[in-house]
Amino acid sequence: MIPADIIASIAGLVNEKDIEKITSEYQDNIWEFVESLVTHVLASNHVGYSDYNTSSFISEELARQKLSCGLNIPNAVSKSLWALHLAHEHVEKLKDLSDIPPIGYRVILEFYLVWQQLLIDPEETIRTEIEPIMEKLRVLIAEENDAFTSEDRCQIQLEMAAVRFQFYEYDKADNLIKSASEECQLNMDLSGMMGKRTRFQQRDIAQLVLIHKDPSTTGTPLPPDSDIPQSLDMNDDTLLEQVAITEQGARVDGRTLNACQLSCLLWIARHESATHRHDVLVHERCSPVLDTVIAARRYWSIQAAALLARAELERGRVRQVDRSCTQSELVVKLQQGVDDPVLIKDRLLRTSYILASGLTPFWQSSVLLAGILNSLGCTSEALLILEKLEMWDGVIDCYKQLGQMDKAETLIRRLIEQKPNDSMLHVYLGDITRNLEYFTKAIELSDDRNARAHRSLGHLLLMDKKFEEAYKHLRRSLELQPIQLGTWFNAGYCAWKLENFKESTQCYHRCVSLQPDHFEAWNNLSAAYIRHGQKPKAWKLLQEALKYNYEHPNVWENYMLLSVDVGEFSQAIQAYHRLLDMNKRGADDEVLELIAQTLLRREAEISMDESEDKAQNEAENRKEKEEMIKLLARISANHQTLSPKTLRVYALLKKPSVLSSETRTEFEKYVRLLEKSLAAANGKLTWPKEEKLALEVVETAVRLAEDRLELAKFIASDTSVKEASAKVRLSLRGILTRLDKDSGSRVSGDETEKLQEIVEVAKSLLDSVAI
């Protein structure tokens, strides 16, 4: 590593020739020289190192302009941009050399990652530049190149995972995290152990904890570092500071883990939080992981990253949000070098594992703090933080919450007076006033390069239901900046309204790739595929939507109907149960009849089948029949009225295939259900006048009569056949009389011949039981 005093020497130089002279002295160690510059940028923005944040040879404002990618500029308060600019110049000269050593590829990776961290938005050109570098590093790691130790390989993979996170490529990040975990032999899993969570808990219940898959891998606890951010207590009158585990087991002790293992755990929790809807389950899964990392009390950057991740996780929980606020405030102060008792020169020791742990720059951590303060109602305090960061978007939102939009407008107009050619300020003014002219002005000032102006204009036109114009501006915005979370969703919605379903699906696909937990996008994507006629694919997409919002009745209803359409009846039944759980569904006779009739038809087809899969098909159909019977029983038990047709298929589902002494009880239940079906159908006064209804009633009556007589003959008691015959006579006579009485008013249709045939069967049955 290049000595730290070289940074001091360079920062004090006033012309570039002197800088070139110093650089030439380190030509043999040029990659270490560039690495020192990158490390200095990290120290200035992440760990509170406040020396040499500016230089004499270039102003920070000029360095910011040189590091800008169009309108995508480094944050206004980011520090030591002079060092990053100098590193950039060297990387541009060195990256195309044919003999780059392994350490060189790693330095280039870290440079681009730091540059991207300091930019306001994800930058597509950086992603393009960094892809071949990461591919080369992947090959070097796979070959187990001697230039990298096992620890180096683990760190590099986590740094590449950090790059993937910057561009919302969570699947690729997940693969890298898993590879890094294997490299550092992290062999752990979440499991339940008995314990207590609250001060008043009398009985142990299962708590989620991190355990060793192989207990023999447990190491010896290591002492904590002296320079480490403090982990604050909750000081809650109900919750314990730590879950008290009473069961003996292979629970992970964070003090036994090395830096790579702790960093991997951080990324595992971060990936879980980023790819799942924020609910109780995600909190339960991430908390044990973060608690394990925090318990280690080692490595400043890892500890700070873990404390910020815990603050982010706890911000939505009533009993923990106070700690979330104070903890993030403490870490932000240390990152800015405020109220830090450690000597400035000693803070350089904190820079190890900054990128591997995913520690954010101080200004991003400050945004987290502002968000937590805002959620607590401390909007004025959040406003002050965002003003210092010059994050005018957030400032406008705070003024909006305070009901002081006039102050926001005054502020932005004053800034425009100072910088009249700053197109972003005109966009902010357009957001405040909702005046299209300001967006148009911003587009003109930027030579049509302002993605934010097109986005805001598109959103405003969308609100006015001018979908065609809105779509044009949203697509232009996405051409300029493809990585925008809400914009892809809105573009997909506009395309849907314009009935351009192909482009709608493309937009929603990009939306869910950037935001896997965006359940509305999953739902809309499924709807677009239905319009395309691709129902099986739409069905699978709805499954993804339900992962991220398990409580949305409309999505469950869509999933139920689509499951019926694609023949996934088991899933349709499960969805119906879920709707009943939410009290959002009564008896949908059409759906119930369709499922039941299909199962009965499939059962008949399987019985005629002679293929090798017959046994398996019978087992699957039997299982679905049992699930359907349970569903119908639940609906009946809830006193919900079923239609005669549904009662009939319910009865047929319950009917045993063979009447025997073992199945007699089930057969009697089947007969009673068929009686209910006939009574419900016969109760409709108009059925004799409607040919289709008349056919259903007579068919049910005939089936009931036949099965009644069959049961009576099986019982074979003195009175059973007489009683059954009497019931058959009473039932069939009444039905045939009503049918004959209204025959003149019944309109003949396609079922006339079939009705006549079943009437003849009924008359024959009646004759057979005549006295």
Curated annotation (Swiss-Prot):
Which keywords does the record carry?
Answer: Cytoplasm, Differentiation, Repeat, TPR repeat
In a knockout, what does one observe? Answer: High level of lethality with a significant reduction in seam cell number. RNAi-mediated knockdown results in defects linked to cell fate determination including impaired hypodermal differentiation, fewer seam cells, possibly due to a change in cell fate, a molting defect in 10% of animals and male tail abnormalities, including reduced sensory ray number. The germline exhibits a mog (masculinization of the germline) phenotype with increased sperm numbers and largely absent oocytes in the gonad.
Q: Report each TPR repeat as a residue range.
A: 389-415, 416-449, 451-484, 485-518, 520-552, 553-586
**Which residue stretches, if any, does this entry annotate as coiled coil?**
none
**Which biological processes are named by the entry's GO terms?**
cell differentiation
Question: What Gene Ontology cellular-component terms does the record carry?
Answer: cytoplasm
Tissue-level expression reads:
Expressed in the spermatheca.
Record-annotated disulphide pairs: none
**Which InterPro entries does the protein's record reference?**
Pentatricopeptide_rpt (IPR002885), TPR-like_helical_dom_sf (IPR011990), TPR_rpt (IPR019734), TTC27/Emw1 (IPR044244)
Compartments, record wording = Cytoplasm
The record's comment on protein family reads: Belongs to the TTC27 family.
What is this protein's function per UniProt? Developmental protein required for cell fate determination in both the germline and seam cells of the developing epidermis. Specifically, involved in sex determination and may function in parallel or downstream of other sex determination factors, including tra-2 and fem-3, to promote oogenesis in its role in the regulation of the switch from spermatogenesis to oogenesis in the gonads. Also implicated in the mitosis to meiosis switch in distal tip cells.
**What is the protein name stated in its UniProt record?**
Tetratricopeptide repeat-containing protein trd-1
Source species of the chain? Caenorhabditis elegans
Query: Source gene?
Result: trd-1
